[in-house]
């Protein structure tokens, strides 16, 4: 396993389109739910243990060799918000382009052909991790970090939060990320039916409201 490949995949500069998404943080800021670093930490922790766990498990399952198309259907079933389903597929399409250019793989090619409009991002992330020679825990860690890192970066722009404080939030959440990655990888090894379906209804509702706004900084 290449540790450097893990850093490349988890790097926020990997051109997979994540910079355009706040992971629900913009809607939370607008609703007054995130006002400072403490609020951000609680928001990210809640996101980690719900949608983060689900996404991490889907990514780990792709590395375990489960059918990507079945995983894509499982991701659809676990994403009740139409806006978030659409965003996940658009992010998956962008991730697919970046991954195929970085780590060419027949598995990535096959999924791209089967889902020309994009597969769910966590599934593509898992196949990218597999192509990079990474394991299920690695893919789960990438997904978990992304779950918290996206909102943390967005809130720096949305609130003018000190970047040092945002980074400290991520550091404090490291034990949660490790826990989520371990749980996700363990579930992935048991099969698709064992994958968690944790959800966050408020995030789903906020995503639909956010998508209907005419003026917004982030797509989600």
Task: Give residue spans per PLM region.
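Conserved active-site and cofactor/substrate-binding residues in soluble primary-metabolism enzymes
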Residues: 15-23, 35-39, 50-57, 86, ...
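Glycine/small-residue-rich interface belts in oligomeric ring/scaffold proteins
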Residues: 2, 6-69
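C-terminal auxiliary extensions adjacent to catalytic cores
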Residues: 33, 37-42, 131, 140-220
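A ubiquitous short alpha-helical element
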Residues: 8-11, 43-45, 79-83, 110-113, ...
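A generic local secondary-structure boundary/capping motif
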Residues: 48, 84, 204-207
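Internal, conserved structured core segments that host functional sites
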Residues: 56, 61, 65-134
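Generic structural signal for hydrophobic core residues of well-folded globular domains
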Residues: 27-32, 47, 51, 62-66, ...
């Amino acid at each position: 396993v290449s540790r450097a490949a893990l850093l490349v995949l988890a790097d926020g500069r990997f051109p997979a389109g994540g910079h355009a998404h706040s992971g629900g943080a913009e809607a939370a800021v607008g609703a007054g739910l995130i006002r400072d670093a403490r609020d951000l930490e609680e928001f990210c922790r809640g996101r980690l243990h719900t949608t983060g766990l689900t996404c991490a498990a889907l990514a780990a399952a792709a590395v375990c060799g489960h059918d990507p198309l079945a995983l894509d259907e499982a991701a659809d079933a676990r994403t009740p918000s139409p806006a978030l389903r659409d965003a996940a597929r658009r992010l998956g399409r962008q991730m697919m382009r970046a991954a195929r250019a970085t780590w060419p793989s027949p598995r990535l090619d096959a999924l791209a052909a089967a889902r020309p409009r994009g597969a769910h991002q966590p599934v593509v992330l898992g196949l990218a991790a597999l192509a990079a020679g990474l394991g299920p825990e690695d893919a789960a860690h990438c997904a978990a970090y992304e779950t918290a890192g996206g909102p943390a970066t967005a809130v720096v722009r949305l609130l003018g939060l000190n970047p040092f404080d945002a980074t400290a939030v991520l550091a404090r959440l490291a034990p949660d990320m490790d826990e989520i990655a371990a749980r996700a990888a363990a579930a992935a090894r048991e099969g698709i039916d064992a994958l968690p379906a944790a959800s966050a209804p408020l995030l789903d509702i906020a995503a639909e409201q956010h998508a209907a706004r005419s003026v917004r900084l982030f797509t989600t």
